[in-house]
């Protein structure tokens, strides 16, 4: 499996696989379910396979076993069909895969009892590094709830683009259920493709709007969105500014800037200037960009608040990431702070729930960027707020 090599993200691999293979609608949905499911439940699957077969399997055999056990554990596919279809894809490992999966069917009750008695990380398929740090931070009950949340399919949530349409108009046109967390959000049964294509809405979690509302840009302001791609927050800032004033939207990746431009054009955003910028290695200066009334710094982070949507994140994180990332985040704050006008506002935000990237960075900013005055912060926690995990802190410049 290409994902296991660690060089590509799961979403990119899936997208390419779907382009390379002509699936029917049903087969496409099943392929996606198994692909994401095997990654999401990898630790649980390996635990069950270990109960059925002590001998270590090669990569191809292990993947076939994971796909088969996942179907037996998490889908409604008939037992015989799940076994037979998996065996047919196993090549030279057919005999081993057939034997292990048939044993699973025979011993399922005992296997489920063993799984129920297993530690949280095994039962809910999370690495020990995350389970341990969350247990220290939240306690075992909330950690269990967080792991359960991360394993649930993400709801389809859209933010209504008021530059083009009102919430009421969209609800009359095709339904959607209001979301209590935010008045511009609707929960959909399925992706509203025509609305997305015509820019009437943008798919995003309501927690992503928190930082923008804390920044509170006004029509006519000059705003810097320092790490802007793919544009969900940028477009919401423009919406709040009624397309008046100016937003300079930056990103380090040319590919991501392309997506940013496409999204802004589709959403009818006209007050944004898109620029490539590396805020760590070669930060643009005041001569190049000028000064800003408002700065949004949505910093690269561990993504531990969005594991439900980014299924491979849990397996990629290492302890050193929680040492490395805060240094980079603090570097970003210091490099953009000089572009803020006196009396201006800067919001630092992440989609992490880790204190090293959030409150501790805020405390560091008081020491390392004394020109910034901390005003307030807010965070969302999935197990408490029923939205993605996020953090935002507001600073002003004296």
Protein language model annotation of sequence segments:
Residues 1-398:
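S-adenosylmethionine
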């Amino acid at each position: 499996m290409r994902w296991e090599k660690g060089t590509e993200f799961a979403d990119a691999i899936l997208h390419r696989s779907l382009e390379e293979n002509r699936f029917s609608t049903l087969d496409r949905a099943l392929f996606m379910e198994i692909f994401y499911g095997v990654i999401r439940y990898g630790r649980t699957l390996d635990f069950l396979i270990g109960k059925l077969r002590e001998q270590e399997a090669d990569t191809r055999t292990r993947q076939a076993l994971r796909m088969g056990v996942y179907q037996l554990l998490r889908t409604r596919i008939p037992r015989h069909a799940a076994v037979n279809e998996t065996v047919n894809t196993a090549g030279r490992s057919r005999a081993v895969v057939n034997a292990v999966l048939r044993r699973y069917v025979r011993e399922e009750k005992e296997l489920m009892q063993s799984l129920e008695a297993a530690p949280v990380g095994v039962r809910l398929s999370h690495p020990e590094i995350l389970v341990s740090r969350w247990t220290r931070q939240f306690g075992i009950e909330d950690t269990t709830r967080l792991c359960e949340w991360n394993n649930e399919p993400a709801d389809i949530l859209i933010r209504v683009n008021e530059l083009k349409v009102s919430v009421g108009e969209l609800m009359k046109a095709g339904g959607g259920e209001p979301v209590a967390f935010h008045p511009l959000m609707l929960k959909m049964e399925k992706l509203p493709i025509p609305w997305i294509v015509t820019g009437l809405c943008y798919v995003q979690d309501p927690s992503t709007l928190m930082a923008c509302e804390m920044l509170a840009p006004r029509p006519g302001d000059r705003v810097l969105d320092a790490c802007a791609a793919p544009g969900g927050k940028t477009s919401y800032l423009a919406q709040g500014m009624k397309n008046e004033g100016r937003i300079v939207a930056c990103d380090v990746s040319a590919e991501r800037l392309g997506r940013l431009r496409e999204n802004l054009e589709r959403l009818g955003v006209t007050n944004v200037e898109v620029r490539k910028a590396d805020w760590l290695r070669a930060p643009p200066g005041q001569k190049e960009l000028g000064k800003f009334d408002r700065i949004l710094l949505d910093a690269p982070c561990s993504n531990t608040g969005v594991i439900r949507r980014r299924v491979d994140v849990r397996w990629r994180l290492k302890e050193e990431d929680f040492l490395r990332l805060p240094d980079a985040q603090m570097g970003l704050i210091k490099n953009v702070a000089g572009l803020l006008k006196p009396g201006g506002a800067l919001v630092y935000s992440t989609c992490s729930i880790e204190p090293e990237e959030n409150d501790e960075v805020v405390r560091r900013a008081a020491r390392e960027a004394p020109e910034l005055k901390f005003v307030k912060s807010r965070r969302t926690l999935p197990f408490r707020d029923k939205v993605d995990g996020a953090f935002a802190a507001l600073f002003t410049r004296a």
